[in-house]
């Protein structure tokens, strides 16, 4: 079994906890003195860095939320001075301000280290040629995977997203053996392959590193069957680092967390209490070694379970199960974060519509689709088809500019969308993700 960094990935649990404790002490001291936001929060809770003596003391520390990052836009949570920041990324969220994350040179070297661990676990070697088909740019996927492939010593082809037929010809002609992309793009690649009259044997892909959106085992089987490769899950988020926070090994029963850099906890999202291993709750991460924008106990809003049983692959790190949902109402559609509240705010700007709407998310031919059903106000409802189509197009255009993905708008008659008592339900997610 190939392991990139056995010293860290196979460390005994006692040694790992001791290392995490040391790193946490150093981190708390660092943010206390460099980030006023954390110093104020800790002072309000009457905690000083001296109170943190081991990793168990993490429960004394404050949580960080997405809203905290937004409120401190752009650089309010940055701990390193601007002269130390060598790169900036931003989250793929579309509401309000994006989350701006600065990286120091050391952060980038940690990132390419954890990515090399992931790729090695998938079976990538120096002899592979690897296509990175995540978006390059502010999104962390492209460059995150790119430098991991380079660090490992394989050949990287920075394909990015875009011309899929050209991409397939490159895979065939350059004998590309691995690909990093979203699972939905992998299926789109398979469809394009069929359209071009080529078979999986013509391209010879061996390994797929798939992430940036939740996907099911059925989807994995289909991708593997149609592209002739073995697909592995990779998890990450820009607020913590980007791809490379956790990864599957050959056993594929959960994803190993790079917990010498990212300390995981599971909490009850209602009471905020830490939960034991084996219990489902909200995933929380602390960046133990980050310099640019470290975070304490960041609430990911992803629901999953942590496991600490030893793995047959020899790695000793804690594993996370599949993401089973969200503790907020965020939807991930084609890799983009979408909140029902965004749709609502667009509808509220248009007097033709009642603020009664329903989002129907589906997966057709393995691509996510979003339909927005909205009620037309009685005084705007008419038999004039041209007028109704113009209203429909106006809403679709507005939604596209706000959400960054296109939605199919369906105009509904007044009072046709069911009203609910209490918490109104605005989402029907027909994708069988669980």
Residue ranges and their predicted role:
Residues 1-90, 95-113, 120-121, 217, ...:
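Nucleotide 5′-phosphate-binding alpha/beta core
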Residues 31, 91-94, 130, 179, ...:
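Conserved S/T- and glycine-rich ATP-binding loop of Class I adenylate-forming
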Residues 104-118, 129-188:
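AMP-binding/adenylate-forming
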Residues 124-128:
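Short helix-loop-beta connector
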Residues 129, 196-215:
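Conserved helix-loop-beta element of the AMP-binding
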Residues 179, 289-405, 422:
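AMP-binding/adenylate-forming catalytic core of the ANL superfamily
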Residues 186-204, 221-225:
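Adenylate-forming
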Residues 206, 215-310:
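Conserved AMP-binding/adenylate-forming
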């Amino acid at each position: 079994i190939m392991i990139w960094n056995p010293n860290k990935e196979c460390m005994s649990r006692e040694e790992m906890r001791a290392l995490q404790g040391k790193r946490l002490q150093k981190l708390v001291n660092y943010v206390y003195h460099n980030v006023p936001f954390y110093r104020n929060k800790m002072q309000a809770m009457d905690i000083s860095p001296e109170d943190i003596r081991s990793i168990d003391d993490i429960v004394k520390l404050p949580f960080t939320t997405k809203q905290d990052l937004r409120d401190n836009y752009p650089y309010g949570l940055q701990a390193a001075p601007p002269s130390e920041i060598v790169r900036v990324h931003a989250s793929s969220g579309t509401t309000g301000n994006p989350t701006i994350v600065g990286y120091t040179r050391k952060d980038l070297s940690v990132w390419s280290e954890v990515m090399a661990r992931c790729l090695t676990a998938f079976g990538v070697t120096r002899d592979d040629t690897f296509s990175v088909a995540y978006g390059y740019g502010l999104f962390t996927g492209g460059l995150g995977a790119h430098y991991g492939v380079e660090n490992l010593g394989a050949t990287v082809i920075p394909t990015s997203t875009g011309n899929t037929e050209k991409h397939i010809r490159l895979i065939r002609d350059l004998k590309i053996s691995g690909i990093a992309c979203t699972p939905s793009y992998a299926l789109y690649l398979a469809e394009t392959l069929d359209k071009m009259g080529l078979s999986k044997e013509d391209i010879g892909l061996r390994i797929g590193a798939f992430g940036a959106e939740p996907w099911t085992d059925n989807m994995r089987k289909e991708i593997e069957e149609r592209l002739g490769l073995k697909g592995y899950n990779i998890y990450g988020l820009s607020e913590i680092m980007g791809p490379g926070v956790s990864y599957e090994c050959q056993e594929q029963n959960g994803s190993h967390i790079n917990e010498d850099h990212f300390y995981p906890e599971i909490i009850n999202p209602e009471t905020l209490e830490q939960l034991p291993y084996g219990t489902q709750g909200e995933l929380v991460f602390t960046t133990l070694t980050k310099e640019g924008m470290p975070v304490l106990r960041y609430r990911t809003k992803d629901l999953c379970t942590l496991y600490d049983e030893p793995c047959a692959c020899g790695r000793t790190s804690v594993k996370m199960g599949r993401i089973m949902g969200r503790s907020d109402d965020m939807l991930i559609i084609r890799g983009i974060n979408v909140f029902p509240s965004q749709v609502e705010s667009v509808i509220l700007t248009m007097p033709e519509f009642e603020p009664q709407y329903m989002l129907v998310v589906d997966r057709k031919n393995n691509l996510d689709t979003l339909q927005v059903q909205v009620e037309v106000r009685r005084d705007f409802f008419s038999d004039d088809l041209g007028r109704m189509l113009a209203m429909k197009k106006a809403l679709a255009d507005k939604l596209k500019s706000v959400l960054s993905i296109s939605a199919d708008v369906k105009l509904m008659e007044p009072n046709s969308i069911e009203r609910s008592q209490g918490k109104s339900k605005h989402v029907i997610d027909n994708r069988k993700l669980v």
